[in-house]
Regions:
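N-terminal nucleophile
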Residues: 1-234
Length: 234
């Protein structure tokens, strides 16, 4: 496409942080498929929280994915999902962000959808494609996002990915816009006890997302499929 490929964008500081993360990585990250079926839940974020507490990485870098949708006055639709790249990735893992239909999908005549959160759920359900196709059938972006979340909830069957009550023990947030400019952000859990939620800033426990129109930027509360926060007891 004409872009110059950089050989290595690491700094000495970032490389040291990555090496420390790699040193602390739990062997249970590397479960074989046959072992994953019966494995108990592993808190993969524990290492990152410890690295932040130790000052190895700043708290603002806890999450790495950003999604943005847009539509202009002519009705042209666009969407983009960025991620943290190779940082904190399990060797061999393929993220959802670069997979069209998983972490991102756009149809210029219908709308755009993308997400932040557990990428494997998107790869399994092709969630962004599902949302855009739901909007094609006339659903509002909010209802289309809720349908994708319900699909993920029902398809999450591995014990290690479920709370004692059967609900997912991970969060995921969808962002969608249609060609008319109607928009929504909907999370599996729209409340969060952490300083920052999957979607961005929290207002008390309510996660909020950013919106920018001709009237300027503002934040709005996310809707949620499951009441409460991910951290609430099941």
């Amino acid at each position: 496409m004409g872009f110059t490929i950089e050989a290595d964008l690491n700094t000495e500081k970032s490389r040291k942080a990555w090496l420390e993360w790699k040193r602390q990585t739990d062997p249970k990250h590397y479960l074989r498929p046959e072992d994953r079926k019966t494995s108990a839940h592993v808190d993969h974020q524990r290492i990152l929280r410890r690295l932040i507490a130790d000052g190895v990485i700043p708290s603002r870098h806890y999450w790495g994915t950003i999604h943005c949708n847009g539509v202009n006055a002519q009705g042209d639709v666009a969407g983009v999902t960025t991620t943290s790249g190779l940082a904190w990735k399990i060797p061999g893992r393929v993220g959802d962000s670069p997979i069209l239909g998983a972490g991102l999908y756009v149809d210029g005549t219908v709308g755009a959808a993308g997400s932040t959160g557990r990428g494997e759920a998107n790869l399994f359900n092709l969630s962004s494609h599902l949302i855009v196709e739901s909007m094609r059938q006339g659903r509002h972006p909010k209802d289309a996002c809720l349908e994708a979340l319900r699909r993920i909830r029902s398809n999450t069957i591995e014990r290690r990915l479920r709370k004692p009550n059967g609900d997912p023990n991970f969060n995921i947030t969808f962002y969608a816009i249609n060609a008319r400019g109607e928009h929504a952000a909907v999370a599996m859990y729209a409340e969060d006890d952490n300083e920052r939620g999957w979607a961005g800033q929290t207002d008390g426990r309510r996660v909020r997302y950013a919106l920018c129109t001709q009237d300027g930027p503002k934040t709005l509360p996310c809707e949620g499929l499951i009441p409460g926060a991910l951290q609430d007891p099941a």
